[in-house]
């Protein structure tokens, strides 16, 4: 029941009236946002999350690490382009043309194709450097990544976010 009062003492509305008026709106919004939330706690699309799981399994990479990279590289937007790098994982067609051909990826803006190329490259870096921090810094194109004594802010952010996503997924 909503209370309609034309005048209030000291101009202050009774709290119960305000709550009763806004409660249906609050409930509707909470249902809307709860139902659209991603299961991993990430804001990237379900399609991208599925590709992260698929290529994570194929290459032995934690899917949450790939998701964290996507969040950092493109904010989960497959249409992003920056400095010649494109898509979710910011792949450079110039540097990864052969890799794309080998993997059969023709559209770098394709969610699945972009993640496939990024995971393949990251896997190669893991094999070469045997260190996830160094691999992330090289992926990011950081100079002297192999001789740095500490992780870069980029690598640290990716690892921290990956751990958060893993906890959200019960790992």
What are the roles of these predicted feature ranges?
Residues 38-171:
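Catalytic glycan-binding domains that act on GlcNAc-containing polysaccharides
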């Amino acid at each position: 029941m909503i209370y309609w009062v034309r005048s209030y003492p000291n101009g202050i509305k009774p709290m119960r009236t305000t709550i009763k008026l806004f409660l249906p709106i609050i409930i509707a919004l909470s249902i809307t946002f709860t139902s659209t939330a991603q299961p991993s706690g990430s804001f990237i699309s379900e399609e991208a999350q599925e590709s992260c799981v698929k290529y994570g399994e194929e290459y032995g990479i934690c899917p949450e690490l790939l998701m964290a990279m996507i969040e950092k590289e493109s904010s989960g937007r497959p249409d992003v382009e920056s400095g010649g790098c494109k898509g979710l994982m910011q792949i450079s067609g110039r540097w990864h043309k052969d890799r794309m051909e080998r993997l059969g990826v023709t559209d770098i803006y394709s969610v699945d194709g972009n993640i496939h190329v990024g995971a393949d490259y990251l896997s190669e870096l893991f094999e070469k450097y045997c260190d996830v921090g160094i691999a992330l810094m090289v992926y990011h194109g950081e100079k002297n990544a192999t001789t740095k004594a500490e992780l870069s802010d980029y690598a640290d952010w990716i690892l921290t976010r990956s751990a958060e996503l893993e906890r959200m997924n019960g790992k």
